Regions:
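Short beta-strand segments of immunoglobulin-like
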Residues: 37-42, 649-654
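Residue-level recognition of secondary-structure-to-loop junctions
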Residues: 88, 94-101, 105, 111, ...
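Short flexible loop/turn segments that cap and initiate beta-strands
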Residues: 55-83, 204, 209, 672-729
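Proline/serine/threonine-rich low-complexity linkers at boundaries of modular beta-sandwich domains
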Residues: 21-32, 636-644
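Enriched for extracellular/lumenal, surface-exposed ectodomains of secreted and cell-surface proteins
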Residues: 101, 105-132, 749-768
Length: 824
């Protein structure tokens, strides 16, 4: 249906705008009503978009003709009239209609006579005034063919099943669910719940690539003692960035450096795209560090598309840069103070409120550019390029009256929904909400103002109570008692108390406790290393996980100080932080991925991906996690990587009835494996290993830890296409820690075979396969026996001897006979 609506918009956009003479006298005009239907034909019960109107455009985007109707004659000759409808300024509009009978419908637009009066400016800014009477008209009847069988729509494309990269073809619309962006370098709790939608978040520690952050040397200094280079904690945070359309942009230097630069890296490949100071004509803007990112969805009469920006700020001045090149685009001055909220089209909103005076205003980055523009907005890019805008002059969408003297301050905002404020003290909690949704009534209307009497223990114990977390998706807010380390929850649909106090946490959490609400669950972590998950609506403890320090490395407590860094795809990722760690850093700090439903460990790396307290923490986009590891101050990309399978079979034929050996290799061919360092260590390629072996294996491959002795390989399926054309699986094997696999098999028929070795993929690798071939011959044929005399040993030796003896006797006899004759 979205496609149909887009087609209607395109059709209406191409209609010419009326050219109005300046100060024209009242006149009249014949009209020519039209009607179209898409799709046509259509299946019964399927929705049709009717295109109705006249080919006359009006002068401003908010104007439209009114009272249009559609006369429908059904296949059974009954009629109905649908409408009335108002057109947009093009003179046309789209109407949804669902036929319920099989057969031919007849559709006809009726345009009623009406005046259109206009005083203002034409497209070029010239003053005009006109009065026009548009006369009544009927469109020709349109036949709509409704058939019994439904028509087919575009089938859509499946999500990727093999390694993918950017850019993503726009036709692969379904892929938006795995290609979200990350727009805030260091999310500020409790305003941001660390939630990252539209991701297939990693379920193993597989590393795609790594590179130095570029600030200083990292890791162990060496040559002096066991200490390492400074990591920016405390007060001089390193890293921090955003990810837009598969490109990671991060701050190269720590926050205290006078000269700053931003690095752009392809998140999928690790390729550096550019490094530069965010400046214009050599003049640096602000502190040169990325403040936040933006992806704006722009739509005008003649142009629709997304525009992305990297924002640098300095006080009330904002500077926009093009992510593709790092070039400056435009500035805004006099931006009001406040918290950034992203609107439905990616616009950045801020809310100004005066509770004493009783007013509320919404400021909008898009309105700074577009509001009160003469003519029509042709394209966003050309309107902002190279310009500076005063954000105070025309950046406000509206300013409305609200009840005076609302207590406390604004706590959370959901644009186009509501704004929630609260006052919290030792004796009372008062929560109120104002409407921001025009479909639910006047903007600024008070939705509720609810007071709750606090327990006496708050005042008696001089407890510090703060607003810990809130979610307008789950409609829950929680307060935290710092000293008692328990929660109190409130319903944000009405401000009423829900539950509390929760059982107290371990004592160290009074020094640092991080709370987030996502998927209907409140997750807490902190200095105590005790991660707990509660049902946000009821307070029921669902699970808890303790990040134990089994080797007594961490000097503050028995468990690792942990904080949530990402919540995405039903998982919560936590990393170890410390306010101002001693050197050498404690060894073995974990990075953990937990199933948010069960608390089960999805994967965990001990001694890798250590986080920072003052710099940029882990972020996720395109289903890949990007982070800086403070152990070596390198940037890592964590996600599913490509694999490569090879297979070999005997090159010479084998005899039917004999066995042959099929062998091959399965390797990791992620971008990080192509460096000289890894090529030197793994000349035959980096072996692909099992998910359960991945954390220790990645430490060995990329961090030079000892090679693990219990590494397991991956399953390989072997199949053949035999000489009869039959495809069949012949068995399975598992590769070893070197990536090598072997399989013996006895072919059962003669002829040529194609053999397939297939790796189905895992949470760490995309699938791969390879082919080879071999031939099976019949055994050699044995010839039939010939009738030949067989000579025995007797024949060979005795017979010749006898014959010789006989010959001698004959000779002797002859000699004797001659002698006897001679005597006579």
């Amino acid at each position: 249906m979205a496609t149909i609506i887009t087609m209607i918009l395109v059709l209406t956009m191409i209609l010419p705008f009326a050219t109005l003479p300046a100060n024209a006298a009242a006149s009249s005009k014949s009209t020519f009503a039209y009607i179209g239907a898409m799709p046509n034909p259509v299946g019964v019960g399927q929705t049709v978009m009717l295109h109705v109107g006249i080919p006359d455009a009006l002068s401003t985007a908010t104007d439209g003709f009114i009272g249009l109707t559609v006369i429908v004659t059904k296949p059974d000759n009954s009629t109905e009239t649908v409408g009335p409808y108002k057109t947009d300024s093009t003179g046309g509009t789209g109407v949804l209609y669902t036929p319920t009978q099989v057969g031919t419908y007849y559709l006809q637009t009726h345009f009623p006579e009406q005046w259109y009066n206009y005083s203002g400016y034409d497209f070029f800014g010239n003053p005009v005034s006109s009065q026009m009477l548009y006369k009544e008209s009927y469109s020709p009847q349109l036949e709509l063919d409704v058939q019994q069988d439904p028509i087919q729509y575009y089938p859509g494309e499946p999500l990727p099943t093999e390694y993918w990269s950017r850019p993503i073809n726009q036709q692969l619309r379904e892929w938006y669910t795995i290609s979200g962006n990350w727009l805030v370098p260091t999310p500020i709790l409790p305003n941001d719940n660390l939630y990252a939608p539209d991701q297939d978040a990693p379920e193993s520690a597989h590393i795609l690539w790594t590179r130095p952050v570029g600030d200083t040397m990292g890791g162990l200094a060496g040559g002096i003692d066991e200490t390492g280079y400074g990591i920016g904690d405390a007060y001089e945070g390193k890293f921090g960035g955003v990810i837009i359309s598969g490109v990671m942009f991060y701050n190269k230097y720590d926050s205290g450096q006078p000269q700053q630069a931003v690095v752009a890296v392809d998140l999928h490949t690790g390729e550096e795209l550019w490094t530069k100071s965010l400046a214009n004509n050599g003049v640096n803007y602000g502190n040169g560090r990325i403040a936040f990112g933006q992806v704006l969805r722009f739509s005008s009469m003649n142009y629709q598309g997304d525009f992305s920006y990297l924002w640098v700020t300095s006080g009330s001045n904002w500077y926009a840069f093009e992510p593709l090149t790092g070039d400056w685009k435009y500035n805004m001055t006099n931006v009001p103070s406040g918290t950034n909220y992203y609107g439905p089209n990616g616009e950045i909103l801020r809310y100004s409120i005066s509770q004493n005076a009783g007013w509320l205003a919404q400021w909008n980055t898009s309105s700074v550019v577009l509001k009160n523009n003469a003519g029509m907005a042709v394209a966003w890019g050309s309107q902002v390029r190279g310009k500076t805008f005063d954000a105070q002059t025309k950046g406000y969408d509206w300013n409305v009256t609200i009840p005076k003297a609302l207590p406390g301050s604004v706590r959370i905002v959901n644009p186009l929904d509501r704004i929630v404020g609260a006052s919290i003290n030792a004796t009372n909690v008062q929560i109120w909400a104002l409407n921001l949704n025009p479909s639910n009534g006047q903007i600024g209307t008070l939705l509720y103002n609810t007071a709750w009497t606090a327990p006496a223990s708050w005042a008696e114990g001089n407890q510090t109570i703060n607003w810990a977390a809130a979610s307008l998706t789950d409609n829950v807010a929680v307060l935290n008692s710092k000293e008692c380390m328990n929660y109190y929850a409130f319903d944000l649909t009405n401000g009423q108390f829900l539950w509390g106090p929760s059982p107290p946490d371990t004592y160290l959490n009074m020094f640092d406790r991080i709370s987030t609400i996502n998927y209907g669950k409140l997750v807490s972590s902190g200095a105590a290393g005790d991660i707990r998950c509660y049902d946000a609506k009821t307070g029921t403890l669902l699970w808890n996980y303790t990040a134990e320090d089994l080797n007594t490395e961490f000097t503050i407590g028995n468990n690792w100080w942990m904080q949530q860094v990402i919540v995405s795809d039903g998982k919560v990722y936590l990393g170890h932080v410390e306010h101002s760690p001693n050197q050498p850093l404690p060894r073995g700090a974990p990075f953990i991925c937990l199933d948010i439903e069960t608390g089960n460990v999805v994967w965990k790396m001990d001694g890798g991906f250590r986080q920072t307290c003052w710099g940029g923490k882990a972020m996720i986009a395109d289903s890949i996690i990007g982070l800086m590891d403070t152990y070596d101050q390198r940037v890592y990309a964590i996600g599913k990587g490509p694999s490569q399978t090879t297979v070999d079979a005997p090159a010479t034929g084998i005899t039917l009835g004999n066995s042959l050996v099929i062998r091959g290799m399965i390797t990791d061919v992620s971008p990080g494996t192509e460096t000289y360092a890894l090529g030197a260590r793994f000349p035959n390629g980096v072996p692909a290993v099992s998910d359960e072996s991945m954390s220790a294996w990645m430490k060995y491959v990329y961090m030079q830890f000892e090679r693990p002795s219990d590494t397991k390989g991956v399953p390989i399926a072997l199949s053949v296409l035999d000489a009869n054309g039959n495809y069949r699986e012949i068995g399975n094997t598992t590769s070893d820690a070197d990536g090598f696999f072997t399989f013996s098999w006895q072919p059962d028929i003669q002829g040529q075979y194609t053999v397939y070795a297939s790796f189905a993929g895992s949470e760490s690798y995309w699938p791969s396969h390879a082919t080879s071939s071999f031939v099976v011959d019949y055994p050699a044929t044995t010839p039939a026996p010939s009738a030949i005399s067989l000579q025995t040993t007797y024949d060979a030796y005795f017979v010749p001897a006898i014959l010789g003896l006989f010959a001698s006797i004959v000779i002797v006899a002859v000699v004797l006979a001659l002698l006897m004759l001679k005597k006579r």
